[in-house]
């Protein structure tokens, strides 16, 4: 299904107190809402510090194809906050205080028969993996076949850590109001790099993210090590979420899940190519050869270059497909003799997936040539 839009889901994540106060409601004047700004700053810190874990929480084999394309956010974690909040953040960083909040503009429809609409100051950005949408965040990386539980465990834990660190510091402050103000400015300045309101699909963003030092974990295999870092052990251990042993086990299971999924797909591809595609192309080459022979016999002077060129092209692609299938078979056999699940997963990504692509290339070309029959 290459080129067909992948399927995912939006994990709407909101935060409210036990008395019903929405901690993510900026109000009419966000620049004056100190509680909201502190919560936002803590979330920025959490996502920036643990971007690798958040990326890993949405790692499934299918997302390797989906993220960064097919109407899905990129694999680079960033936060979209909209023009209004970005302006407030920049005011606080540059001057130490925010004096105003932008209001929404007008959305030009470009259609003379339709009116222009008021544009929300937060707007929406479908290319962002973690977007603020008025009074909540949307985490948009979770794959359709995956549970949202892993993503929410990570989100809740990393934000809890940021809240705890903020609370520990503020509870010791002699001047609470001044301490809150200073903390907001400090956190916003330290983690400003995680804010990105632009086009997440662009190559320019990939380059900019690298300059900012943001991780770009393009595939599931690259993201799994985030589970077994000292940072992860401390985070989940301090809050009683996972022990070190549980995280190591989860990483092993993730490697196994990836490897088995790719192996099944590779075997399916070998089967399809061997039992359906190659026989169909062989039948078509026979038809072409018979046509060419019949034309030559019936009218030697007739131009048979079309049949000749087509027969040569199809035969060459058939040979390419046969060679690629044999190569993939050999790699699948080699995979069986690798004992470590981590090494199996890397072997799948580094060797088997490129071999699968090498097999599908001639098959895709033949699909545009060989008739439906």
Each language-model region and where it sits:
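C-terminal amphipathic alpha-helical interaction region
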Residues: 189-373
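Active-site capping/gating regions of soluble enzymes
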Residues: 1-253
